Every structure is written in structure tokens, then in C-alpha cells.
Amino acid sequence: TILALMIGIGGGVGTMMAGILSDRMGKKDVRWNMWLVGIVGIVAAPFSVMGYLSATGQTALLWLVIPTIVGAFYFGPTLAMLHTLVKPEMRSLASAIMLFINNIFGLGIGPLMVGMMSDALTPRYGVQGLGIALALMVIIGLWGSVHYLIGGRSLARDIAAAQAQAR
């Protein structure tokens, strides 16, 4: 119950924070719309790992405060950049594709991978197998964060090209 409240309330706060920060920083340099998401993901990763590997539920909840707040940080800036880069008549389809991929991996393949790793790790590590499996999944989040940083480097050029194509 506590974790669900943390995710719900923290996710809402984080989503709003991301929108505000991304808009503010993006006015100075549009690349910050992507860089912000990448940096926040990298900063949150160690907190996630510590939470997943914690010995007690209370300690895990404390470590997971930051990751629950920034867990949905990517959503607003990502949709904004997606809508900026595609033609107006393609925004609905682009959003649908992004949400489809997000759900396939986030709600389908990701949990399946965690379960399979947990099953494989439990004979050796006991009840810690699930925590280790979750901690290993942080690597995928870091990989995504690095790609936000890389994507940010060419974002201004990509936006200019998209706007030129729209004319």
C-alpha cells in the first residue's frame, strides 16, 4: 500500500516537475529536453539498486523515494519531443506507437524478464533472487538514459529538419 502511494503520488509529482523543468530548461537550449531525462535516469539508478537490494521493506521504501518520483520523468518531455519531430498529421499514430512499445516492454517483456531472472537466481540467492533480478534491470534503464543524452546532441538539428520538411 505504501509503495503504491509512493508510486502514484511520487509519479504525479515527478511528471509535473519534469514538465516544468523541461519547459524552463528547453527555452534556453532545446537539447535539455532530452538531457534532463537522461541525467535524471542516471542519478536515480543507484537509488533503485539500493532499494531492490535492501534487507528490509522500510529501508527499501526509503531508497525508492527518488526513483518513484522520477520514474515517469521521461513521459512529458518524450511526448513533447515526439510531437515536435513528427508531422502534425502523424502525432496520434506516433503517440500510439510509442505507447504500444512502452507497454510491450514495460508491462510485458520487462516483468517476464524479471520473473525469469528471479527464477534462475533464487536457487543460489534465495529470497534475494528477486531483488537481484530487479537490480539487474536497472542496466536497461541506464542504457535508455544514455540514449537520451546521445539523442539530445542532435535534437536542435532534428527539429530544424522536421520543421523544414513540414513547409
Describe these PLM feature segments.
Residues 16, 20, 24-25, 53, ...:
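Membrane-interface helix caps of multi-pass small-molecule transporters
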Residues 32-35, 116-141:
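A membrane-interface helix-boundary motif in multi-pass transporters
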Residues 11, 15, 85-123:
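A late C-terminal transmembrane helix in Major Facilitator Superfamily
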Residues 12, 57, 69-77, 104, ...:
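Hydrophobic transmembrane alpha-helices of Major Facilitator Superfamily
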Residues 1-25, 40, 108:
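Transmembrane alpha-helices of Major Facilitator/SLC transporters
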Residues 2-11, 67, 102, 140:
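Transmembrane alpha-helical segments of major facilitator superfamily
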Residues 45-55, 135-167:
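Multi-pass alpha-helical transporter architecture, strongest
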Residues 30-78:
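C-terminal transmembrane helical hairpin of 12-TM major facilitator-type secondary transporters
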